[in-house]
Amino acid sequence: MILHLIYGPTCSGKTDMAIQIAQETGWPVVALDRVQCCPQIATGSGRPLESELQSTRRIYLDSRPLTEGILDAESAHRRLIFEVDWRKSEDGLILEGGSISLLNCMAKSPFWRSGFQWHVKRLRLGDSDAFLTRAKQRVAEMFAIREDRPSLLEELAELWNYPAARPILEDIDGYRCAIRFARKHDLAISQLPNIDAGRHVELIEAIANEYLEHALSQERDFPQWPEDGAGQPVCPVTLTRIR
């Protein structure tokens, strides 16, 4: 079985690359993302729209209400192994995402030692200014009012009505920044979807900078697979941590 692994920091184009390969191969994409397992925060977690998937298949490791909490890394890894094992009759799978904890669980597991042919592509952070430009564009898209999906701020305003969801939201990039922004400006969370243009721009910039901090931590803490063209078998269990 061929496993095509695509990993890298947020806003690096992983999903677009996975969709392209899925179109070319017909293989499903398994999302290596624990936050995307909560459909109630589809926009803020970066889940692609059905139209963006362009008829390709995308598999999430769970589907749960946010109040149940974010799926822990060990559970996500067990579900990933189940998905891969269950689909071994297929020619290949695409594994795409940027969960530091899940990728490191994979690095430590003997499951990935044998029985697979690996193709690995790691996307890099690159220049910080270029990253911030991409991140601002992405956040602006998340703030856009659409008929087919609530905006990030609408998701936050709705979920804030559930006290059990609040500490979880305060621990997720984007939502955490918006909550702090509301407190700084003495705004109710319910007011965030209707802030004026100036504050809109300010919040977009703040979230983009939070994404940059997260991307830097991903670059630092990701395991390291030999990539295609390395001239040696690709085996995740031999990974070394980037210090």
Swiss-Prot record:
Pfam families: IPT (PF01745). It catalyses: dimethylallyl diphosphate + AMP = N(6)-(dimethylallyl)adenosine 5'-phosphate + diphosphate. Keywords: Crown gall tumor, Cytokinin biosynthesis, Plasmid, Transferase. Transfers dimethylallyl groups to AMP as part of the biosynthesis of cytokinin phytohormones. GO terms for molecular function: AMP dimethylallyltransferase activity. This is Adenylate dimethylallyltransferase. GO terms for biological process: cytokinin biosynthetic process. InterPro entries: P-loop_NTPase, Tzs. It is an enzyme of class 2 (transferase). The keyword Cell membrane does not apply. Its EC number is 2.5.1.27. It comes from the Bacteria.
